[in-house]
Design a protein with these regions (language model features):
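A short, flexible N-terminal coil/short beta segment enriched in small residues
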Residues: 1-15
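Glycine-rich phosphate- or other oxyanion-binding loops that anchor nucleotides, phosphorylated ligands
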Residues: 11-200
Length: 200
């Protein structure tokens, strides 16, 4: 179920959409003043949350969270800023990427890649990653394309942090824990850039 949280602080320009509780925990304090909406995981919950989010205040809308890399050029903890998000139907929505990348780099975060993020309705493993990568996408998630309508004409950005890669898929609990901690820390470090992007 979706849940709205308000972070402390004065800047209230950003509506931040995050699928999971752990992602919200990473970003809540990192983006003071943002309205944080936990959307739930997967397309059905994301689509329902987008309807709710479209009615919430915020001059800018961003999606933050984890993703799977589609290429081994990326590694766990790397930041992916979407140039566009693509649904499983191939439809794409352009994102505000350059100002966000600049804000990240101003904060010393250099492991940042920009490119398409594709959203699907299932966990992607094995050869399917290569198929999606062949279409030019850098990363995969299960929500961003369904959350995009929430922007409703407002600036829209997607910031995802790599959880696993084709060569380092997380299928065991210990591997998931290690990768999760790495991704969580990177997401927390990236959070202030989202606030700067929204305030620009």
């Amino acid at each position: 179920m979706s849940e709205v949280e308000r972070a402390g602080g004065a800047a209230k320009r950003l509506l931040l959409l995050v699928p999971m509780v752990v992602e919200a925990a990473a970003l809540r304090r990192a983006v003071p003043g943002a309205t944080v909406l936990r959307t739930g995981v997967g397309p059905a919950r994301a689509a329902a949350a987008a309807v709710k989010a479209s009615r919430l205040a915020g001059a800018a809308v961003a999606v933050g969270g984890f993703c799977g890399a589609l290429t081994d050029d990326l590694r766990p903890g790397d930041i992916v800023v979407a140039s566009e998000v693509r649904g499983s139907d191939g439809h794409g929505v352009r994102c505000s990427s350059e100002p966000l990348v600049a804000a990240l780099r101003e904060r010393g975060l250099q492991r940042v890649s920009v490119g398409p993020v594709v959203s699907v309705d299932h966990v992607v493993r094995g050869a399917e990653r290569a198929i999606l990568a062949a279409g030019g996408a850098l990363a995969v998630d299960m929500e961003s394309a369904w959350l995009a309508p929430a922007a409703a004409g407002r600036p829209f950005a997607v910031l995802r942090v790599v959880l696993d890669t084709p060569a380092r898929e997380v299928t065991r609990p210990l591997a998931m824990l290690i990768a999760g901690v790495t991704a969580w820390r990177a997401l927390r470090r990236a959070g202030p850039a989202l606030g700067a992007w929204a305030a620009a």
